[in-house]
Amino acid sequence: MRGCQKKFDERVPILRKCIFIHGAPNTGKTYATERALAGRKTLHVGGGGTGKFDSLKPSHDAIIVDDDVCPNLLNMSDNYSCKAYRRGRNNPIWAGEWLIVTSNLPFREWLFKCGFSYKEEDSHVKAMFSRFFVCKVVGDDSSAELYLLNPSTRGLVEEQKQRMRDFLQFQKVFNDTIQNYHAEKSRNDFDAFAFVTNHCPFGDFPERQKKAFASLYDNGS
């Protein structure tokens, strides 16, 4: 803790990697993110509400914000140790290198949810685009991959190069994982309607239950 406090007090630079991943629900983006961060102590937050970072510890090297907003985003995405909240007490210091956001929303809409302006010329919005690798999960179940839409441009050239190298390694593991995820998912797909009709024909059901079951699976819903 004292080392973390010293970094905060002396504003020691950190090569922080901020990655935003936009994708539809159930595409495996959070699972692939966790695998790409394997070996790093990671705090996983989501579900709305306050106190998201109350469990944050100095030993956390990564944070995954899963379909949720991120408080104090300007500081959390900066290249220095920071405090998680804007309050005085019970405010944990974070000196980790990875801030990953997974969302069903595009980046600009997510920023708006976090309290930023929707105007492109807003200085804080520009700062976010310079700090984040903005990505999207593209393709179908058989060929999903993480596609880079906007690279991070923050810092000196050598910092940008190292940050890009780190991102590319993250992207490689992410893509390997998400493709395996979809392959495994397709092998485990279960058609409940087909199973029941094959093993327990509708003739064995009372009429009312037969109608209810048929409507439940009507049109693939």
Model-derived features with residue positions:
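AAA+/P-loop NTPase substrate/partner-engagement loops
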Residues: 39-72
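Glycine-rich phosphate-binding P-loop
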Residues: 16-38
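N-terminal pre-Walker A segment at the start of P-loop NTPase domains
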Residues: 1-15
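A generic local structural motif
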Residues: 5-8, 48-53, 85-89, 120-122
